[in-house]
A protein has these predicted regions:
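Active-site beta3 strand of CheY-like receiver
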Residues: 28-34, 39
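Two-component/phosphorelay signaling modules centered on CheY-like receiver
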Residues: 1-13
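Short amphipathic alpha-helix used as the core "switch/output" element in two-component signaling
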Residues: 23, 45-58
Length: 173
């Protein structure tokens, strides 16, 4: 497995038991885990549960590997949070395809999240000043007003300043 993945430019860290796997993931979270169901010290399914308690499937894809090649084993792994399942003996082509697909999905989700954050910033701030735009001010003002009228909120004040031809001032200075 390691050789096949390394040949395709993927860096691999190999551990041979669950205890060291936990330590390795805790010290540096990998982009992808290939996890055998049968380990010398901890059941791979229990280890999967521990990883899922700390990392979502979006942030840490885990492909389970097992000699059990039946529907129930596959379903159990997926139900516990595995991203995918590979039966032994491993087929190198399928291994690479599933590893690449899992990594691409993770990277696309991360890129989409960054774009959403950037879009949110653009939608809520003025590009010239970097302060909140009118929509945000009106939304927050409306919420504060509603809270105040319901008796739940505190007193509030709102100051609106409008500078004519601000873009010209900003471009000049």
């Amino acid at each position: 497995m390691q050789r096949r993945l390394s040949q395709h430019g993927l860096k691999c860290r190999v551990v041979y038991d669950g205890t060291n796997a936990l330590k390795a993931v805790e010290s540096k979270t990998p982009d992808l885990i290939l996890l055998d169901v049968i380990l010398p010290d901890i059941n791979g399914l229990e280890l999967l549960k521990e990883f899922r308690a700390k990392h979502s499937a979006d942030e840490l894809p885990i492909i389970m590997v097992s000699a059990f090649n039946d529907v129930d084993s596959t379903a159990k792994c997926i139900k516990l949070g595995a991203t995918d399942y590979l039966p032994k003996p491993l087929n190198g082509t399928i291994l690479m395809a599933k590893a690449v697909a899992s990594l691409e999905a993770k990277y696309f989700r991360e890129a989409n999240q960054k774009l959403l954050e950037e879009l949110h910033i653009r939608a809520t701030t003025c590009p010239l000043t970097g302060i909140f735009n009118r929509k945000v001010v009106f939304d927050h003002g409306e919420n504060a007003f509603l809270e105040r009228n319901s008796g739940e909120g505190k007193d509030f004040s709102l100051l609106s300043v409008d500078i004519d031809f601000f873009k010209k001032v900003n471009d000049t200075y």
